[in-house]
Amino acid sequence: MKHIRTVHFVIALCLFGIGLAHAENDIINDAEYEYLRSQHGPKWDAEDKEIDRTLGDIREKNGGKRPNILYILIDDVSFGQMGNRTLNYVTGIKTPRINKFAEEGLSLMRMYTEPSCTPTRAALLTGRHPVRTGLKEVKVALVGEGLPASEVTIAEVLSASGYRTSHVGKWHQGDIEQSYPHNQGFDYAAFPLHQQVQLSLMTDEAADSFRLIGYAKKTQSNAFAVDKKFKPSGLVTGVEAKKGGSAREIDLKPGEKWTQDHYIRMNERYQRQTLEQLRELAKGDKPFFLQYWPLWPLNFVNDQEENLSHNGGHFAEKLQRLDGMMGEVFDEVDKLGIVDNTLVVLMADNGLMHFYPSSASGLNQLIYRGGKTDHLEGGVRVDAFVRWPGVIEAGSAAGDIVHVTDLYTTFARLGQATEYIPTDRVIDGIDQTALLLKGEHHGRRDYVYIYENEILRSVVKQEFKMHVPRPGLPGAGAPVFNLYRDPREEEPFVGLPLWSGASFQDMIKRHMMMIAKYPHAKLGKGRPYEGIENLRPESKDTVATFMSWQPAQQ
Protein backbone atom coordinates (compact mmCIF):
# COMPACT_ATOMS: atom_id res chain seq x y z
CA MET A 1 0.00 0.00 0.00
CA LYS A 2 1.34 3.37 -0.92
CA HIS A 3 1.67 5.95 1.83
CA ILE A 4 -1.61 7.68 2.68
CA ARG A 5 -1.46 10.86 4.69
CA THR A 6 -4.16 10.90 7.37
CA VAL A 7 -4.13 14.59 8.09
CA HIS A 8 -7.14 16.19 9.71
CA PHE A 9 -8.74 18.74 7.45
CA VAL A 10 -11.60 21.16 7.95
CA ILE A 11 -12.27 22.64 4.54
CA ALA A 12 -12.20 26.40 4.56
CA LEU A 13 -15.39 26.86 2.64
CA CYS A 14 -16.04 30.09 4.47
CA LEU A 15 -13.97 31.25 1.50
CA PHE A 16 -17.07 30.53 -0.53
CA GLY A 17 -19.54 31.64 2.13
CA ILE A 18 -20.62 28.07 2.79
CA GLY A 19 -19.40 27.35 6.29
CA LEU A 20 -17.40 24.39 7.60
CA ALA A 21 -17.40 20.75 6.59
CA HIS A 22 -18.81 18.26 9.06
CA ALA A 23 -16.17 17.38 11.60
CA GLU A 24 -16.23 13.59 11.30
CA ASN A 25 -15.41 13.62 7.60
CA ASP A 26 -11.76 14.19 6.81
CA ILE A 27 -12.27 13.68 3.07
CA ILE A 28 -11.79 16.84 1.03
CA ASN A 29 -14.79 17.10 -1.26
CA ASP A 30 -15.27 19.55 -4.09
CA ALA A 31 -16.96 22.83 -3.18
CA GLU A 32 -20.32 21.99 -4.74
CA TYR A 33 -20.81 18.99 -2.48
CA GLU A 34 -20.00 21.04 0.61
CA TYR A 35 -22.45 23.64 -0.66
CA LEU A 36 -25.13 20.92 -0.64
CA ARG A 37 -24.00 19.60 2.74
CA SER A 38 -24.45 23.03 4.25
CA GLN A 39 -28.14 22.65 3.36
CA HIS A 40 -28.67 18.96 4.22
CA GLY A 41 -25.92 18.01 6.68
CA PRO A 42 -28.05 17.15 9.75
CA LYS A 43 -30.46 15.06 7.68
CA TRP A 44 -27.61 13.17 5.98
CA ASP A 45 -25.84 12.59 9.29
CA ALA A 46 -29.00 11.03 10.73
CA GLU A 47 -29.38 8.85 7.64
CA ASP A 48 -25.76 7.73 7.94
CA LYS A 49 -26.30 6.52 11.49
CA GLU A 50 -29.28 4.49 10.30
CA ILE A 51 -27.25 3.13 7.37
CA ASP A 52 -24.40 2.12 9.68
CA ARG A 53 -26.85 0.08 11.74
CA THR A 54 -28.25 -1.53 8.59
CA LEU A 55 -24.79 -2.42 7.28
CA GLY A 56 -23.90 -3.84 10.69
CA ASP A 57 -27.01 -6.05 10.61
CA ILE A 58 -26.09 -7.25 7.10
CA ARG A 59 -22.56 -8.16 8.23
CA GLU A 60 -23.92 -9.99 11.27
CA LYS A 61 -26.28 -11.96 9.04
CA ASN A 62 -23.25 -12.98 6.93
CA GLY A 63 -21.06 -14.12 9.79
CA GLY A 64 -19.36 -10.76 10.23
CA LYS A 65 -18.13 -10.72 6.64
CA ARG A 66 -18.24 -7.52 4.62
CA PRO A 67 -19.81 -7.67 1.14
CA ASN A 68 -17.93 -8.88 -1.89
CA ILE A 69 -17.88 -6.40 -4.77
CA LEU A 70 -17.96 -7.43 -8.43
CA TYR A 71 -17.60 -4.48 -10.80
CA ILE A 72 -18.22 -5.02 -14.53
CA LEU A 73 -17.47 -2.19 -16.96
CA ILE A 74 -18.66 -2.55 -20.57
CA ASP A 75 -16.89 -0.58 -23.30
CA ASP A 76 -18.51 2.00 -25.62
CA VAL A 77 -22.25 1.33 -25.40
CA SER A 78 -25.08 3.84 -25.89
CA PHE A 79 -27.61 4.44 -23.13
CA GLY A 80 -30.44 1.93 -23.64
CA GLN A 81 -28.34 -0.50 -25.67
CA MET A 82 -28.48 -3.15 -22.93
CA GLY A 83 -30.76 -3.98 -20.03
CA ASN A 84 -33.97 -2.83 -21.70
CA ARG A 85 -36.26 -5.33 -23.43
CA THR A 86 -38.20 -2.64 -25.30
CA LEU A 87 -35.09 -1.05 -26.79
CA ASN A 88 -33.77 -4.52 -27.65
CA TYR A 89 -36.56 -4.62 -30.23
CA VAL A 90 -35.57 -1.19 -31.51
CA THR A 91 -31.92 -2.15 -32.03
CA GLY A 92 -32.32 -5.78 -33.04
CA ILE A 93 -29.92 -6.86 -30.29
CA LYS A 94 -31.09 -9.18 -27.51
CA THR A 95 -29.57 -8.80 -24.04
CA PRO A 96 -31.85 -11.07 -21.97
CA ARG A 97 -29.33 -11.84 -19.23
CA ILE A 98 -28.42 -8.21 -18.63
CA ASN A 99 -32.14 -7.32 -18.82
CA LYS A 100 -32.89 -9.87 -16.10
CA PHE A 101 -29.97 -8.63 -14.02
CA ALA A 102 -31.31 -5.07 -14.29
CA GLU A 103 -34.73 -6.24 -13.08
CA GLU A 104 -33.16 -7.90 -10.04
CA GLY A 105 -31.77 -4.66 -8.67
CA LEU A 106 -31.56 -0.89 -9.04
CA SER A 107 -31.27 0.92 -12.37
CA LEU A 108 -29.33 4.18 -12.03
CA MET A 109 -31.05 6.26 -14.68
CA ARG A 110 -28.74 9.27 -14.44
CA MET A 111 -25.31 7.70 -14.22
CA TYR A 112 -22.64 9.99 -15.66
CA THR A 113 -19.15 8.97 -16.69
CA GLU A 114 -16.29 10.68 -18.49
CA PRO A 115 -16.45 10.97 -22.31
CA SER A 116 -13.94 8.18 -23.06
CA CYS A 117 -12.49 4.99 -21.64
CA THR A 118 -9.18 6.00 -20.03
CA PRO A 119 -10.69 8.97 -18.15
CA THR A 120 -13.71 6.99 -16.92
CA ARG A 121 -11.54 4.15 -15.65
CA ALA A 122 -9.19 6.59 -13.93
CA ALA A 123 -12.19 8.31 -12.34
CA LEU A 124 -13.48 5.03 -10.92
CA LEU A 125 -10.06 3.94 -9.70
CA THR A 126 -9.18 7.21 -7.95
CA GLY A 127 -12.53 8.80 -7.13
CA ARG A 128 -11.24 11.94 -8.85
CA HIS A 129 -11.94 13.74 -12.09
CA PRO A 130 -9.22 12.52 -14.47
CA VAL A 131 -8.12 16.08 -15.15
CA ARG A 132 -6.78 16.02 -11.58
CA THR A 133 -4.65 12.92 -12.22
CA GLY A 134 -3.50 13.59 -15.79
CA LEU A 135 -5.41 10.62 -17.26
CA LYS A 136 -7.64 12.91 -19.29
CA GLU A 137 -7.44 11.43 -22.80
CA VAL A 138 -7.20 8.16 -24.70
CA LYS A 139 -3.79 7.02 -25.94
CA VAL A 140 -3.35 4.23 -28.48
CA ALA A 141 0.36 3.49 -28.96
CA LEU A 142 3.50 3.95 -26.83
CA VAL A 143 3.37 7.05 -24.60
CA GLY A 144 5.61 6.48 -21.56
CA GLU A 145 2.79 7.73 -19.34
CA GLY A 146 0.21 6.37 -16.97
CA LEU A 147 -1.65 6.45 -13.68
CA PRO A 148 0.83 7.90 -11.18
CA ALA A 149 1.97 5.93 -8.16
CA SER A 150 0.86 8.84 -5.97
CA GLU A 151 -2.80 8.11 -6.68
CA VAL A 152 -4.60 5.85 -4.21
CA THR A 153 -6.89 3.47 -6.06
CA ILE A 154 -10.04 1.81 -4.80
CA ALA A 155 -8.13 -1.48 -4.94
CA GLU A 156 -5.53 -0.06 -2.55
CA VAL A 157 -8.21 1.33 -0.26
CA LEU A 158 -10.05 -1.99 -0.06
CA SER A 159 -6.83 -4.01 0.12
CA ALA A 160 -5.70 -1.98 3.13
CA SER A 161 -8.92 -2.95 4.90
CA GLY A 162 -8.44 -6.67 4.24
CA TYR A 163 -10.07 -7.28 0.85
CA ARG A 164 -8.59 -9.59 -1.75
CA THR A 165 -8.43 -7.80 -5.09
CA SER A 166 -8.31 -8.99 -8.72
CA HIS A 167 -8.54 -7.31 -12.10
CA VAL A 168 -9.34 -9.05 -15.40
CA GLY A 169 -9.67 -7.39 -18.81
CA LYS A 170 -9.14 -3.96 -20.26
CA TRP A 171 -7.00 -1.60 -18.16
CA HIS A 172 -5.85 1.28 -20.39
CA GLN A 173 -4.18 3.29 -17.62
CA GLY A 174 -0.74 3.57 -19.16
CA ASP A 175 2.29 1.63 -20.36
CA ILE A 176 4.69 2.39 -17.49
CA GLU A 177 5.41 0.11 -14.56
CA GLN A 178 3.83 2.24 -11.84
CA SER A 179 0.52 2.28 -13.74
CA TYR A 180 0.02 -1.51 -13.99
CA PRO A 181 -2.88 -2.87 -11.92
CA HIS A 182 -0.70 -5.16 -9.80
CA ASN A 183 1.22 -2.03 -8.79
CA GLN A 184 -2.01 -0.16 -8.08
CA GLY A 185 -3.48 -2.40 -5.40
CA PHE A 186 -4.58 -5.57 -7.20
CA ASP A 187 -3.33 -8.93 -5.95
CA TYR A 188 -3.80 -10.48 -9.39
CA ALA A 189 -4.15 -8.93 -12.83
CA ALA A 190 -4.66 -10.20 -16.39
CA PHE A 191 -4.87 -7.33 -18.86
CA PRO A 192 -3.78 -5.91 -22.23
CA LEU A 193 -1.28 -3.05 -22.10
CA HIS A 194 -3.15 -1.05 -24.73
CA GLN A 195 -6.68 -1.28 -26.15
CA GLN A 196 -8.91 -2.49 -28.95
CA VAL A 197 -7.56 -0.25 -31.70
CA GLN A 198 -4.32 -2.23 -31.44
CA LEU A 199 -6.05 -5.53 -30.76
CA SER A 200 -8.85 -5.55 -33.34
CA LEU A 201 -8.26 -2.68 -35.78
CA MET A 202 -4.51 -2.80 -36.49
CA THR A 203 -4.76 -6.21 -38.15
CA ASP A 204 -4.78 -7.65 -41.66
CA GLU A 205 -8.34 -8.85 -41.10
CA ALA A 206 -9.48 -5.28 -40.42
CA ALA A 207 -7.69 -4.20 -43.59
CA ASP A 208 -9.44 -6.94 -45.55
CA SER A 209 -12.77 -5.69 -44.19
CA PHE A 210 -11.92 -2.12 -45.23
CA ARG A 211 -12.07 -1.03 -41.58
CA LEU A 212 -8.43 0.04 -41.55
CA ILE A 213 -6.84 2.27 -44.15
CA GLY A 214 -3.16 3.03 -44.48
CA TYR A 215 -1.72 0.79 -41.76
CA ALA A 216 -1.44 -2.53 -43.57
CA LYS A 217 0.51 -2.61 -46.83
CA LYS A 218 -2.29 -4.51 -48.54
CA THR A 219 -4.55 -1.42 -48.30
CA GLN A 220 -1.97 1.25 -49.04
CA SER A 221 1.76 1.17 -49.74
CA ASN A 222 3.60 4.43 -50.32
CA ALA A 223 6.95 4.08 -52.08
CA PHE A 224 7.79 7.67 -51.14
CA ALA A 225 7.70 6.94 -47.39
CA VAL A 226 11.06 7.70 -45.76
CA ASP A 227 10.24 7.11 -42.08
CA LYS A 228 10.05 3.32 -41.65
CA LYS A 229 8.95 3.57 -38.01
CA PHE A 230 6.01 5.95 -38.35
CA LYS A 231 3.43 3.18 -37.99
CA PRO A 232 3.20 1.72 -34.46
CA SER A 233 4.59 -1.80 -34.23
CA GLY A 234 6.06 -4.18 -31.69
CA LEU A 235 3.46 -3.28 -29.08
CA VAL A 236 2.99 -5.56 -26.07
CA THR A 237 -0.37 -7.34 -26.06
CA GLY A 238 -1.73 -9.20 -23.00
CA VAL A 239 0.15 -9.69 -19.74
CA GLU A 240 -0.45 -11.32 -16.38
CA ALA A 241 1.04 -10.51 -12.99
CA LYS A 242 0.67 -10.72 -9.23
CA LYS A 243 1.22 -7.97 -6.69
CA GLY A 244 4.90 -7.49 -5.97
CA GLY A 245 6.04 -9.41 -9.05
CA SER A 246 6.92 -8.80 -12.66
CA ALA A 247 4.48 -9.10 -15.53
CA ARG A 248 4.78 -11.61 -18.36
CA GLU A 249 3.41 -11.26 -21.87
CA ILE A 250 1.44 -14.38 -22.71
CA ASP A 251 -0.15 -13.82 -26.12
CA LEU A 252 2.68 -13.57 -28.65
CA LYS A 253 5.99 -15.25 -29.34
CA PRO A 254 8.92 -13.33 -30.85
CA GLY A 255 8.22 -12.61 -34.51
CA GLU A 256 4.59 -13.71 -34.30
CA LYS A 257 1.97 -11.47 -35.90
CA TRP A 258 -1.16 -10.42 -34.03
CA THR A 259 -4.42 -11.48 -35.71
CA GLN A 260 -8.15 -11.25 -35.17
CA ASP A 261 -8.05 -14.84 -33.93
CA HIS A 262 -5.68 -13.75 -31.16
CA TYR A 263 -8.21 -11.08 -30.19
CA ILE A 264 -11.06 -13.59 -30.04
CA ARG A 265 -9.00 -15.93 -27.87
CA MET A 266 -8.03 -13.04 -25.58
CA ASN A 267 -11.70 -12.20 -24.98
CA GLU A 268 -12.54 -15.83 -24.30
CA ARG A 269 -9.57 -16.19 -21.96
CA TYR A 270 -10.58 -13.15 -19.91
CA GLN A 271 -14.03 -14.66 -19.51
CA ARG A 272 -12.53 -17.93 -18.24
CA GLN A 273 -10.16 -16.09 -15.92
CA THR A 274 -13.02 -14.08 -14.45
CA LEU A 275 -14.89 -17.27 -13.63
CA GLU A 276 -11.69 -18.80 -12.22
CA GLN A 277 -11.08 -15.74 -10.07
CA LEU A 278 -14.63 -15.85 -8.76
CA ARG A 279 -14.19 -19.47 -7.69
CA GLU A 280 -10.81 -18.82 -6.11
CA LEU A 281 -11.87 -15.67 -4.29
CA ALA A 282 -15.10 -17.22 -3.03
CA LYS A 283 -13.12 -19.95 -1.23
CA GLY A 284 -11.45 -17.55 1.15
CA ASP A 285 -12.58 -16.04 4.42
CA LYS A 286 -11.82 -12.51 3.26
CA PRO A 287 -14.20 -10.38 1.20
CA PHE A 288 -13.12 -9.68 -2.36
CA PHE A 289 -13.17 -6.93 -4.96
CA LEU A 290 -13.14 -8.27 -8.52
CA GLN A 291 -13.07 -6.03 -11.58
CA TYR A 292 -14.02 -7.49 -14.94
CA TRP A 293 -13.62 -5.04 -17.83
CA PRO A 294 -14.39 -6.92 -21.09
CA LEU A 295 -12.92 -5.87 -24.43
CA TRP A 296 -16.03 -6.83 -26.39
CA PRO A 297 -18.32 -5.47 -27.83
CA LEU A 298 -15.59 -3.44 -29.59
CA ASN A 299 -14.79 -5.50 -32.65
CA PHE A 300 -13.79 -4.13 -36.04
CA VAL A 301 -14.13 -7.29 -38.13
CA ASN A 302 -17.27 -9.15 -39.17
CA ASP A 303 -15.87 -12.46 -37.94
CA GLN A 304 -18.93 -14.48 -36.91
CA GLU A 305 -19.91 -17.48 -39.01
CA GLU A 306 -23.61 -16.93 -38.37
CA ASN A 307 -25.36 -13.90 -36.92
CA LEU A 308 -26.65 -14.14 -33.37
CA SER A 309 -28.61 -10.90 -33.53
CA HIS A 310 -31.23 -9.53 -35.91
CA ASN A 311 -28.99 -6.49 -36.23
CA GLY A 312 -25.89 -8.24 -37.60
CA GLY A 313 -23.42 -5.38 -37.11
CA HIS A 314 -20.05 -6.54 -35.83
CA PHE A 315 -20.28 -4.50 -32.59
CA ALA A 316 -23.89 -5.62 -32.18
CA GLU A 317 -22.97 -9.28 -32.61
CA LYS A 318 -20.36 -9.08 -29.89
CA LEU A 319 -22.71 -7.24 -27.53
CA GLN A 320 -25.23 -10.04 -27.87
CA ARG A 321 -22.49 -12.62 -27.31
CA LEU A 322 -21.24 -10.61 -24.33
CA ASP A 323 -24.72 -10.78 -22.84
CA GLY A 324 -24.42 -14.56 -22.72
CA MET A 325 -20.99 -14.25 -21.12
CA MET A 326 -22.43 -11.95 -18.45
CA GLY A 327 -25.05 -14.59 -17.81
CA GLU A 328 -22.27 -17.11 -17.12
CA VAL A 329 -20.77 -14.72 -14.57
CA PHE A 330 -24.12 -14.16 -12.83
CA ASP A 331 -24.76 -17.91 -12.78
CA GLU A 332 -21.35 -18.54 -11.23
CA VAL A 333 -22.09 -16.09 -8.42
CA ASP A 334 -25.30 -18.04 -7.75
CA LYS A 335 -23.58 -21.45 -7.88
CA LEU A 336 -20.91 -20.34 -5.43
CA GLY A 337 -23.56 -19.42 -2.88
CA ILE A 338 -22.29 -15.87 -2.46
CA VAL A 339 -25.11 -13.98 -4.18
CA ASP A 340 -26.67 -12.61 -0.97
CA ASN A 341 -23.43 -11.01 0.17
CA THR A 342 -22.13 -9.78 -3.18
CA LEU A 343 -22.76 -6.34 -4.61
CA VAL A 344 -22.63 -6.54 -8.41
CA VAL A 345 -22.41 -3.39 -10.53
CA LEU A 346 -22.65 -3.54 -14.33
CA MET A 347 -22.40 -0.37 -16.40
CA ALA A 348 -20.91 1.18 -19.54
CA ASP A 349 -17.84 3.39 -19.52
CA ASN A 350 -19.11 5.98 -22.03
CA GLY A 351 -21.25 6.31 -25.14
CA LEU A 352 -20.69 4.46 -28.36
CA MET A 353 -17.87 5.14 -30.81
CA HIS A 354 -20.26 7.26 -32.88
CA PHE A 355 -17.65 8.40 -35.37
CA TYR A 356 -17.40 4.76 -36.50
CA PRO A 357 -20.28 4.14 -38.95
CA SER A 358 -23.36 2.52 -37.44
CA SER A 359 -23.99 0.81 -40.78
CA ALA A 360 -21.00 -1.39 -39.93
CA SER A 361 -21.03 -1.53 -36.14
CA GLY A 362 -24.79 -1.91 -35.73
CA LEU A 363 -24.84 0.42 -32.72
CA ASN A 364 -26.35 3.90 -32.79
CA GLN A 365 -26.95 6.92 -30.58
CA LEU A 366 -30.51 5.98 -29.56
CA ILE A 367 -31.94 8.51 -27.07
CA TYR A 368 -29.08 10.93 -26.51
CA ARG A 369 -27.03 12.81 -29.08
CA GLY A 370 -23.28 12.31 -29.29
CA GLY A 371 -20.98 9.55 -28.15
CA LYS A 372 -17.44 8.70 -27.15
CA THR A 373 -15.21 11.80 -26.65
CA ASP A 374 -18.28 14.13 -26.40
CA HIS A 375 -19.49 16.17 -23.44
CA LEU A 376 -23.01 15.67 -24.81
CA GLU A 377 -25.35 13.30 -22.96
CA GLY A 378 -24.72 10.62 -25.56
CA GLY A 379 -21.08 10.58 -24.53
CA VAL A 380 -21.48 10.51 -20.76
CA ARG A 381 -24.96 9.12 -19.88
CA VAL A 382 -24.73 5.35 -19.56
CA ASP A 383 -26.68 2.32 -18.45
CA ALA A 384 -25.84 1.29 -14.89
CA PHE A 385 -27.39 -1.52 -12.84
CA VAL A 386 -26.71 -2.53 -9.24
CA ARG A 387 -27.77 -5.79 -7.58
CA TRP A 388 -27.53 -6.89 -3.96
CA PRO A 389 -30.40 -9.29 -3.16
CA GLY A 390 -32.23 -8.56 0.06
CA VAL A 391 -30.49 -5.21 0.44
CA ILE A 392 -31.23 -3.30 -2.76
CA GLU A 393 -34.87 -3.36 -3.84
CA ALA A 394 -35.43 -5.50 -6.94
CA GLY A 395 -37.08 -3.85 -9.92
CA SER A 396 -36.27 -0.37 -8.67
CA ALA A 397 -34.94 2.69 -10.49
CA ALA A 398 -33.53 6.03 -9.41
CA GLY A 399 -33.47 9.35 -11.23
CA ASP A 400 -30.88 10.77 -8.83
CA ILE A 401 -27.65 11.95 -10.45
CA VAL A 402 -24.65 9.67 -9.89
CA HIS A 403 -21.11 10.08 -11.22
CA VAL A 404 -18.68 7.21 -11.75
CA THR A 405 -16.35 8.68 -9.09
CA ASP A 406 -19.10 8.07 -6.53
CA LEU A 407 -18.47 4.32 -6.75
CA TYR A 408 -15.00 4.85 -5.25
CA THR A 409 -16.36 6.39 -2.07
CA THR A 410 -19.41 4.13 -1.93
CA PHE A 411 -17.37 0.93 -2.30
CA ALA A 412 -15.07 2.16 0.46
CA ARG A 413 -18.04 2.81 2.76
CA LEU A 414 -19.53 -0.62 2.13
CA GLY A 415 -16.14 -2.23 2.77
CA GLN A 416 -15.52 -0.28 6.00
CA ALA A 417 -12.47 1.21 4.32
CA THR A 418 -13.25 4.93 4.33
CA GLU A 419 -10.34 5.59 6.68
CA TYR A 420 -7.93 4.62 3.89
CA ILE A 421 -9.20 7.24 1.44
CA PRO A 422 -6.49 9.93 1.14
CA THR A 423 -7.19 13.23 2.85
CA ASP A 424 -4.57 15.43 1.19
CA ARG A 425 -6.39 15.97 -2.14
CA VAL A 426 -9.85 16.58 -3.54
CA ILE A 427 -12.01 13.47 -3.80
CA ASP A 428 -14.84 14.08 -6.27
CA GLY A 429 -16.67 10.87 -5.46
CA ILE A 430 -19.61 11.15 -3.09
CA ASP A 431 -20.76 8.33 -0.84
CA GLN A 432 -24.05 7.17 -2.38
CA THR A 433 -24.74 4.30 0.03
CA ALA A 434 -27.98 5.99 1.07
CA LEU A 435 -29.21 5.86 -2.52
CA LEU A 436 -28.42 2.14 -2.83
CA LEU A 437 -30.00 1.14 0.48
CA LYS A 438 -32.88 3.62 0.78
CA GLY A 439 -33.68 4.09 -2.90
CA GLU A 440 -34.71 6.96 -5.12
CA HIS A 441 -34.55 10.53 -3.78
CA HIS A 442 -31.75 9.63 -1.36
CA GLY A 443 -28.89 10.63 -3.65
CA ARG A 444 -26.45 13.30 -2.51
CA ARG A 445 -25.49 14.85 -5.81
CA ASP A 446 -27.43 17.08 -8.21
CA TYR A 447 -24.51 18.24 -10.34
CA VAL A 448 -21.74 17.05 -12.66
CA TYR A 449 -18.74 18.79 -14.19
CA ILE A 450 -17.98 17.38 -17.65
CA TYR A 451 -14.52 17.72 -19.17
CA GLU A 452 -13.21 16.93 -22.62
CA ASN A 453 -9.53 16.33 -21.93
CA GLU A 454 -8.48 19.31 -19.76
CA ILE A 455 -11.28 21.61 -20.95
CA LEU A 456 -14.45 22.02 -18.88
CA ARG A 457 -17.18 21.77 -21.55
CA SER A 458 -20.45 21.35 -19.64
CA VAL A 459 -21.96 21.67 -16.20
CA VAL A 460 -25.08 19.74 -15.19
CA LYS A 461 -27.25 20.94 -12.32
CA GLN A 462 -30.51 19.14 -11.65
CA GLU A 463 -32.35 18.92 -15.00
CA PHE A 464 -30.38 21.78 -16.51
CA LYS A 465 -27.16 21.65 -18.49
CA MET A 466 -24.99 24.55 -19.57
CA HIS A 467 -22.48 24.23 -22.36
CA VAL A 468 -19.63 26.33 -21.01
CA PRO A 469 -19.50 29.55 -23.04
CA ARG A 470 -16.44 30.49 -25.01
CA PRO A 471 -14.17 33.09 -23.38
CA GLY A 472 -15.70 36.53 -23.44
CA LEU A 473 -19.30 35.29 -23.71
CA PRO A 474 -21.37 36.00 -20.55
CA GLY A 475 -23.15 33.21 -18.73
CA ALA A 476 -26.48 34.73 -19.72
CA GLY A 477 -25.55 34.06 -23.34
CA ALA A 478 -24.48 30.44 -22.89
CA PRO A 479 -26.50 27.54 -24.32
CA VAL A 480 -28.56 26.02 -21.49
CA PHE A 481 -30.81 23.00 -21.98
CA ASN A 482 -33.61 21.40 -19.99
CA LEU A 483 -32.63 17.74 -20.29
CA TYR A 484 -36.14 16.49 -19.61
CA ARG A 485 -37.56 18.57 -22.45
CA ASP A 486 -34.57 18.47 -24.79
CA PRO A 487 -32.52 15.34 -24.01
CA ARG A 488 -30.58 15.64 -27.27
CA GLU A 489 -29.37 19.17 -26.45
CA GLU A 490 -30.52 20.57 -29.76
CA GLU A 491 -32.61 23.62 -28.84
CA PRO A 492 -31.12 25.92 -26.19
CA PHE A 493 -33.88 28.14 -24.80
CA VAL A 494 -33.02 31.78 -24.19
CA GLY A 495 -35.20 31.90 -21.09
CA LEU A 496 -32.93 29.46 -19.26
CA PRO A 497 -29.53 31.19 -19.20
CA LEU A 498 -31.10 34.54 -18.30
CA TRP A 499 -31.87 33.22 -14.80
CA SER A 500 -29.41 30.30 -14.50
CA GLY A 501 -26.30 31.67 -16.18
CA ALA A 502 -24.99 33.42 -13.08
CA SER A 503 -25.62 30.37 -10.89
CA PHE A 504 -23.78 28.11 -13.32
CA GLN A 505 -20.88 30.58 -13.42
CA ASP A 506 -20.78 30.53 -9.61
CA MET A 507 -20.55 26.73 -9.70
CA ILE A 508 -17.59 26.97 -12.05
CA LYS A 509 -15.90 29.59 -9.86
CA ARG A 510 -16.24 27.41 -6.76
CA HIS A 511 -14.85 24.44 -8.68
CA MET A 512 -11.89 26.43 -10.00
CA MET A 513 -11.12 27.87 -6.56
CA MET A 514 -10.72 24.33 -5.23
CA ILE A 515 -8.42 23.48 -8.14
CA ALA A 516 -6.31 26.51 -7.27
CA LYS A 517 -6.12 25.34 -3.66
CA TYR A 518 -5.41 21.71 -4.58
CA PRO A 519 -3.58 21.72 -7.95
CA HIS A 520 -3.71 18.79 -10.33
CA ALA A 521 -1.30 15.91 -9.79
CA LYS A 522 1.47 15.22 -12.25
CA LEU A 523 0.87 12.45 -14.77
CA GLY A 524 3.06 9.42 -14.21
CA LYS A 525 6.06 9.31 -16.57
CA GLY A 526 8.61 6.63 -17.30
CA ARG A 527 10.11 4.13 -19.69
CA PRO A 528 7.43 2.03 -21.39
CA TYR A 529 7.16 -1.68 -20.65
CA GLU A 530 9.50 -1.75 -17.65
CA GLY A 531 8.50 -4.54 -15.29
CA ILE A 532 7.66 -6.97 -18.11
CA GLU A 533 10.22 -9.74 -17.87
CA ASN A 534 9.86 -11.38 -21.28
CA LEU A 535 9.73 -8.49 -23.74
CA ARG A 536 9.96 -9.61 -27.35
CA PRO A 537 12.88 -8.22 -29.41
CA GLU A 538 10.47 -6.21 -31.54
CA SER A 539 9.01 -4.61 -28.40
CA LYS A 540 12.48 -3.73 -27.14
CA ASP A 541 13.23 -2.11 -30.48
CA THR A 542 10.00 -0.10 -30.31
CA VAL A 543 10.89 1.14 -26.82
CA ALA A 544 14.42 2.03 -27.89
CA THR A 545 13.08 4.06 -30.81
CA PHE A 546 10.60 5.83 -28.55
CA MET A 547 13.20 6.62 -25.88
CA SER A 548 15.72 7.92 -28.43
CA TRP A 549 13.94 11.26 -28.67
CA GLN A 550 12.61 11.57 -25.11
CA PRO A 551 13.93 14.24 -22.70
CA ALA A 552 16.83 13.09 -20.55
CA GLN A 553 14.83 13.13 -17.29
CA GLN A 554 12.78 10.15 -18.47
Residues covered by each model-derived region:
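Active-site segment of extracytoplasmic enzymes that catalyze sulfate/phosphate-ester chemistry
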Residues: 27-29, 38, 45, 78-166, ...
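Core domains of carbohydrate- and sulfate-ester-processing enzymes
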Residues: 28, 33-42, 109, 119-122, ...
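Short, solvent-exposed turn/loop segments enriched in Gly/Ser/Thr/Pro and often Arg
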Residues: 76, 85-89, 107-128, 167-178, ...
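Active-site His/acidic residue clusters
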Residues: 79, 204, 254, 269, ...
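Histidine-centered active-site microenvironments of extracellular/periplasmic hydrolases
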Residues: 93, 177-185, 300-303, 307, ...
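C-terminal cap/loop subdomain of S1 sulfatases and analogous C-terminal strand-loop tails that border
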Residues: 188-198, 352-375, 392-396, 400, ...
